[in-house]
Amino acid sequence: MSKKILFLIKVIVFIFTTFSLPLYAEKIRDLTSIQGIRDNPLIGYGLIVGLDGTGDQSTQAPFTNQSLKNMLSQLGVSIPSNTNMNTKNVAAVIVTANLPPFSHAGEKIDVVVSSMGNARSLKGGTLLMTPLKGANNQIYAIAQGNILVSEKNNKKSKIHNFYSNQVNSGKIHHGATIEREIDNNFGKQKTINLQLNQENFSTAQRISDMINTKYPDTATPINSKTVQLNTSANNDVQVHMLSNIQDIDISLPSQEAKVVVNSRTGSIVINQSVRLGSCVVSNGNMSIIVHQIKNKKRDLYFLKSFNKNIKKDQSIEDMADKNYMNDIATNKENLHNIVRALNKLGTKPDELMSILQLMKSAGCLNAKLEIV
């Protein structure tokens, strides 16, 4: 059995754990949003013309021909019903956009255009006048313009089954003109609700306390997600108050410990709050021992008793002098060291996910494990 296999069987990872959570400051503007002040999604159906033979095939996308006939009819062009319009330079698309809060008629917004037929490319196409509607089926903007398609590195990945850039979708910068404004109740009510981006009772209470320090008896934490502000129904007063409140610094403990794993690629993201407890987790032919380092020399004896790669005649002093522990063990308190050690051993992504799940189940991984 090779040294690598022996090393895989017993991976000894020492973790020096610490439980002090550093505080850091965030502004209220970065932690909350104002209820009712948000973007509104818009959607529309339109046609792109001017394609270089890369549009929809009429036999497989009949709705494109039907839409083209309807458009020409509205422009006064009569097309016989039995005419087969086999055009290859037209494509049916879905147009989407976001209408920002407090937008006014006449402003421009960006739009995203996506093919809904079998067009091979939208490069060089022009979007014809397309009404964009909201959830209430009212028209809020009109889109039209030349579409910009990114073809940079447009090759299929050999490792993962996806394209780095798609040519059947694109953007139109300032491609839509706002025609209708959305009403909002800002400045018309005596209360304003701040919505926390991440629900947390402690954060809600701290935000309320800091606001009341500057504006006494103004803020009330309703729940872990909402802090209510009591004010007067006046635009000037609310704008002035919010501008000051949003700049208040809030001292918060470290963020929620979380480990996010991409099941397809094996990518792992670990935030700085992840801490490990002492335990032993086994998966297949691998065993991971997570242990607190208290005495380096004593723990080297412990390491030597478990790891078959260490020569029997190798002295503890020699191991310490050669900094042996830095090669196969760590004394950090985060999960990054375990993942790095396993990656060096050639652990596959599915094996790594199994190990993390076992560590979570055993209570060794004190963090939220999210697999996407």
From Swiss-Prot:
Subcellular location: Bacterial flagellum basal body
Any one cellular-component term (Gene Ontology): outer membrane-bounded periplasmic space
One BP term from GO: bacterial-type flagellum-dependent cell motility
Entry keyword ATP-binding: no
Keyword field: Bacterial flagellum, Signal
GO molecular function, one term: structural molecule activity
Pfam families registered for this protein in UniProt: FlgI (PF02119)
Known partners and oligomeric status: The basal body constitutes a major portion of the flagellar organelle and consists of four rings (L,P,S, and M) mounted on a central rod.
Described function: Assembles around the rod to form the L-ring and probably protects the motor/basal body from shearing forces during rotation.
Name by which UniProt lists this protein: Flagellar P-ring protein
